[in-house]
């Protein structure tokens, strides 16, 4: 028998290796290094939103009631943006505005910046989580790449747009009706629906919905009917190892319907990835443009002719007048600190009126 005497080749683990072993251990809910960013940020963002919508008023920032405590419901409650006078202050609890007073911090709109930044980093943490897991199980990172699209939209709408304006005040508040108000604001002040980047975003989202419906229906239509047992459709069995539907049949069907069809599964699924992700990224780029007050399409010749000819009006000129109406009515209500007053005679009226 040979006995080897000497130093063990197995060195003791350092702190990093110990943490790595624990964080990336196979468990029911994966934690990972990304979880150090994701879980705290998601917890604080959601907790801040539930706290704000339940208890915190918007009286001091918008002159509105916005909490369940004041009588709002799920659709009308919101965590509102800080007042316009606070510009782009981070509104830290210990900052010069609140000076450590939690009640004052909530009244000033501190919860909005708290939720916006923790929410943004939480979303980034979720994308990193997908990268980390994909690397662990040797998958391509397309899930994480796809998730970059909603992150781009969130960051552009909630952070970049108000940074381009005079303050966080002009970002969307975190609530259902508040988001609707923001959409009306975008239309009235930026003519957003006529912006080509918005058009690409709509095409991407609705096109993706159409592709999802067609793809799901086609797969269900071409499931193999295997055997004559009690469970006729073995394709619904999650342990079935063989292919569950016929790509050849699907290709033949759509070739007859449209004259063209996907003949390759990889190209088909890449297209389903490409359409919505590109659409959302285009929308995000468009919102960055709005942050800089870039204009959408302007058809000035139609506006001039409509102004000169009482009988000439197009859907475009009607929409321009609607936008003027939104600006006139919304500015006075939405920016009470400006003390704007518009007499009846200056409110826009179309030629049809």
From Swiss-Prot:
The keyword Glycoprotein does not apply. The modification Phosphothreonine is found at residue 2. One of its GO terms (biological process) is photosynthetic electron transport in photosystem II. It is found in: Plastid, Chloroplast thylakoid membrane. A plastoquinone binds at residues 215, 262. Pheophytin a binds at residues 130, 143. Chlorophyll a ChlzD2 binds at residue 118. InterPro entries: D1/D2 (IPR055266), Photo_II_D1/D2_sf (IPR036854), Photo_RC_L/M (IPR000484), Photo_RC_L/M_CS (IPR055265), PSII_PsbD/D2 (IPR005868). Its EC number is 1.10.3.9. It catalyses: 2 a plastoquinone + 4 hnu + 2 H2O = 2 a plastoquinol + O2. One of its GO terms (cellular component) is chloroplast thylakoid membrane. Keywords: Acetylation, Chlorophyll, Chloroplast, Chromophore, Electron transport, Iron, Magnesium, Membrane, Metal-binding, Oxidoreductase, Phosphoprotein, Photosynthesis, Photosystem II, Plastid, Thylakoid, Transmembrane, Transmembrane helix, Transport. The keyword Transcription regulation does not apply. CDD domains: Photosystem-II_D2. The modification N-acetylthreonine is found at residue 2. The chain crosses the membrane at residues 41-61, 125-141, 153-166, 208-228, 279-295. Chlorophyll a PD2 binds at residue 198. Photosystem II (PSII) is a light-driven water:plastoquinone oxidoreductase that uses light energy to abstract electrons from H(2)O, generating O(2) and a proton gradient subsequently used for ATP formation. It consists of a core antenna complex that captures photons, and an electron transfer chain that converts photonic excitation into a charge separation. The D1/D2 (PsbA/PsbD) reaction center heterodimer binds P680, the primary electron donor of PSII as well as several subsequent electron acceptors. D2 is needed for assembly of a stable PSII complex. PSII is composed of 1 copy each of membrane proteins PsbA, PsbB, PsbC, PsbD, PsbE, PsbF, PsbH, PsbI, PsbJ, PsbK, PsbL, PsbM, PsbT, PsbX, PsbY, PsbZ, Psb30/Ycf12, at least 3 peripheral proteins of the oxygen-evolving complex and a large number of cofactors. It forms dimeric complexes. HAMAP family: PSII_PsbD_D2. 2 of the reaction center chlorophylls (ChlD1 and ChlD2) are entirely coordinated by water. Belongs to the reaction center PufL/M/PsbA/D family. This is Photosystem II D2 protein. It comes from Psilotum nudum. The gene is psbD.
């Amino acid at each position: 028998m040979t006995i080897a005497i000497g130093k063990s080749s197995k060195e003791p683990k350092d702190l990093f290796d110990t943490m790595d072993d624990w964080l990336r251990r196979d468990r029911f809910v994966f934690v990972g290094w990304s979880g150090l960013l994701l879980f705290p940020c998601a917890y604080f963002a959601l907790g801040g939103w539930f706290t704000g919508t339940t208890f915190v008023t918007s009286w001091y920032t918008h002159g509105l009631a916005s909490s369940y405590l004041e009588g709002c419901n799920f659709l009308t409650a919101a965590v509102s943006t800080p007042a316009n006078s606070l510009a782009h202050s981070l509104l830290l609890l210990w900052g010069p505005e609140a000076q450590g007073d939690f009640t004052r911090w909530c009244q000033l709109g501190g919860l909005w910046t708290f939720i916006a930044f923790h929410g943004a980093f939480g979303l980034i943490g979720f994308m990193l989580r997908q990268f980390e897991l994909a690397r662990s199980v040797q998958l391509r990172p397309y899930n994480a790449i796809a998730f970059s699209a909603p992150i781009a939209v969130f960051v552009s709408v909630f952070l970049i747009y108000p940074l381009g304006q005079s303050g966080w005040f002009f970002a969307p508040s975190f609530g259902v009706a508040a988001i609707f108000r923001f959409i009306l604001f975008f239309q009235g002040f930026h003519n957003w629906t006529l912006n080509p980047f918005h058009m690409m975003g709509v095409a991407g989202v609705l096109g993706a919905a159409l592709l999802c419906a067609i793809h799901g229906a086609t797969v269900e239509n071409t499931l193999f009917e295997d055997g004559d047992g009690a469970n006729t459709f073995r394709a619904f069995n999650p342990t079935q190892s063989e292919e569950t539907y016929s790509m050849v049949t699907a290709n033949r069907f759509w070739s007859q319907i449209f004259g063209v069809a996907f003949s390759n599964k990889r190209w088909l699924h890449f297209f389903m990835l490409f359409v919505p992700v590109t659409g959302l990224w285009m929308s995000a780029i468009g919102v960055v443009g709005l942050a800089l007050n870039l204009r959408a399409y302007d058809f000035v010749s139609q506006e001039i002719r409509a102004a000169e000819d009482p009988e000439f009006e197009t859907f475009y000129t009607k929409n321009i007048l609607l936008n003027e109406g939104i600006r006139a009515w919304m500015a006075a209500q939405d920016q009470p600190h400006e003390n704007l007053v518009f007499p009846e005679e200056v409110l826009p009226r179309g030629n049809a009126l």
